[in-house]
Amino acid sequence: MSRSIRNQDVPELPRRRQVRTVGMSGNYWYVVEIDGRLKPRQVKRVRFWGQDIALFRDAAGELHAVEDRCPHRQLPLSQGFVEGGNLVCTYHGWKFDGCGRCTEIHHELGKGRTRLPRIRIRTYPVKAQWGLIWLFPGDPALADGTPLPTIPQLEGGRPWPFFPIDVTIKAHFSMIVENVCDFNHEYLHRHKRPFLQPILREWKQDADSVRVYYDTRFDGSPVAKLFMEGGARDLNEIEIWYQYPYQGSDIGGKYIHWLFMLPEDERTTRCFFVFLFGPIHVPIVNWKMPEFLRKPILWFTNKWYIEPLLGEDKWALELEQDGFERHPDAPQIELNPAISSFQRLSLEKWKAYQQSMERAGPKPAADPA
């Protein structure tokens, strides 16, 4: 479906309250951590829509993800430690391997037993790609057949360098989708000026994505003036997508961003931003930046400009979440007709996921091995 914004009525959004409570489908790969932050023999707790998961690397550096709950006394396994290939509960010393099996019990009632308790905690498919750790929280049988997003700039012999930005926002993921896809909040960034005078040209929706197209200017930001080719004066449009459950944008094939959201609960979303810069130029002379300077410049740009810019969105979104909780039944006047498409897609995907779980039936937290 493709629609122009011409002659469109301002839509009513009766689904607003509903979309602020749904989760995301577990049958996709989600970024749960930056790869370099989890060293061998380390364990961390991550969360997907109320599911606490212990993410750890064994002594050999292999990734594992298990339910963050020792079946003995229900303590979080993420409070324990890694020993060899096992995750050890810090309370009684019960050990679990990466397949979720109990491999050893430390105390005298467990030592020397020829048969350990036949229990197995839930495990999750997990892998590292592009410097990010991805986890599949849904039906594990679907993991191998579910692809990661296609990012050609990160493939091949010379992938574009980047430094991922990790931001936790105390807001529902649907608010974040609307924020990053709706350029009508230009006023919030009136001092940093990342885009100017945006005009929504059209939007398209299919079963898995919504794409919006804006005419806008990018030559107002200091990053554009300093490092973008020609000060970005020849760039005047952007394509933005909500390719469920991922979000991203493309400015002329030269400057691209991806947002990988990890919905922790109804009011908390961990966001992993990836900003990909193609041509970067030396200020004033407008020469192509030498390769050895690209990474330092990208790191500097993140710290000096992009992270403070995202901080403005975080501030506004957390206030929006607070306002929604205080006034959940207040009518919302929405002028951007594409917003209803984002909300509809989130609702449809969540409904389909719930139906798939109902067909599969309930699964016990700890199954017989």
UniProtKB/Swiss-Prot annotation:
Cofactor(s) it depends on: [2Fe-2S] cluster
SUPFAM superfamilies: Bet v1-like, ISP domain
Binding of [2Fe-2S] cluster, residues: 70, 72, 89, 92
Domain Rieske: 29-135
Coiled-coil residue windows: none
Pathway: Steroid biosynthesis; sterol biosynthesis
Keyword Lyase: no
Keywords assigned by UniProt, alphabetized: 2Fe-2S, Iron, Iron-sulfur, Lipid biosynthesis, Lipid metabolism, Metal-binding, Monooxygenase, Oxidoreductase, Steroid biosynthesis, Steroid metabolism, Sterol biosynthesis, Sterol metabolism
InterPro entries linked: Cholesterol_7-desaturase (IPR050584), Rieske_2Fe-2S (IPR017941), Rieske_2Fe-2S_sf (IPR036922), VanA_C_cat (IPR044043)
Gene3D superfamilies (UniProt xref): Naphthalene 1,2-dioxygenase Alpha Subunit, Chain A, domain 1, Rieske [2Fe-2S] iron-sulphur domain
A molecular-function term among this protein's GO annotations: monooxygenase activity
Residues annotated as signal peptide: none
Keyword hit for Protein transport: no
Catalytic activity: a 3beta-hydroxy-4,4-dimethylsteroid + 3 NADH + 3 O2 + 2 H(+) = a 3beta-hydroxy-4alpha-methylsteroid-4beta-carboxylate + 3 NAD(+) + 4 H2O; 4,4-dimethyl-5alpha-cholesta-8,24-dien-3beta-ol + 3 NADH + 3 O2 + 2 H(+) = 4beta-carboxy-4alpha-methyl-5alpha-cholesta-8,24-dien-3beta-ol + 3 NAD(+) + 4 H2O; a 3beta-hydroxy-4,4-dimethylsteroid + NADH + O2 + H(+) = a 3beta-hydroxy-4beta-hydroxymethyl-4alpha-methylsteroid + NAD(+) + H2O; a 3beta-hydroxy-4beta-hydroxymethyl-4alpha-methylsteroid + NADH + O2 + H(+) = a 3beta-hydroxy-4beta-formyl-4alpha-methylsteroid + NAD(+) + 2 H2O
Cofactor note: Binds 1 [2Fe-2S] cluster per subunit.
EC number(s) given by UniProt: 1.14.13.246
GO BP of this protein: sterol biosynthetic process
Role this protein plays: Participates in the biosynthesis of bacterial sterols. SdmA oxidizes the sterol 4beta-methyl group into first a hydroxyl, then an aldehyde and finally a carboxylic acid group.
Protein's recorded name: 4beta-methylsterol monooxygenase
